[in-house]
């Protein structure tokens, strides 16, 4: 059996093109999307990830703001910063970069981000929506996997064990 080659860069570029059109429409209506990246402490992998985020959002016209906090920041201070971003109408998306220092409760801080501003889809509400097949605000990794599968042209609706042979025959 041979596999299907999936070119993630092609899929990513298609997504970026669609997002750019949506962002342009929002800007024409007077609404400029802004993503805030919260980074706590120093981590070279996170630094690289943030640079890639900044590059990609600039490609589609989204404003990018990085909020850096020292590793010894308190939970209360991070919580307050997130709450302030939640109520700021200029901020349309928030992402909490991981890993964060071990003394901070990632689950609690992630749950502090309002579900409508939770870019990663890690708020408990967003994760719960998966059960109801509401992926509009789902976890970004899961949505990326679905987009990659869609890029193959294979039908992914209603797949179960009884459909496995059809899927296997199309991938040979």
Give the residues covered by each predicted segment:
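Short beta-strand elements in bilobed, periplasmic/extracellular small-molecule ligand-binding domains
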Residues: 57-71
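Single conserved hydrophobic/aromatic residue that forms the stacking wall/gate
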Residues: 162-172
């Amino acid at each position: 059996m041979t596999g299907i080659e999936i070119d993630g860069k092609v899929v990513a570029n298609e997504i970026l093109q669609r997002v750019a059109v949506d962002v342009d429409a929002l800007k024409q209506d007077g609404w400029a999307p802004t993503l805030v990246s919260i980074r706590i402490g120093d981590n070279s992998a996170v630094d690289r990830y943030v640079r890639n985020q900044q590059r990609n959002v600039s490609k589609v016209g989204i404003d990018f703001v990085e909020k850096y906090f020292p590793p010894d920041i308190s939970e209360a201070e991070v919580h307050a910063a997130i709450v302030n971003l939640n109520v700021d109408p200029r901020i349309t998306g928030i992402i909490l970069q991981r890993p964060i220092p071990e003394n901070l409760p990632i689950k609690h801080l992630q749950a502090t981000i309002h579900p409508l501003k939770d870019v990663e889809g890690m708020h408990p509400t967003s994760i719960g929506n998966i059960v109801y097949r509401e992926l509009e605000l789902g976890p970004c990794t899961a949505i990326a996997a679905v987009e990659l599968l869609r890029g193959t042209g294979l039908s992914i609706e209603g797949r179960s064990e009884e459909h496995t042979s059809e899927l296997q025959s199309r991938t040979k």
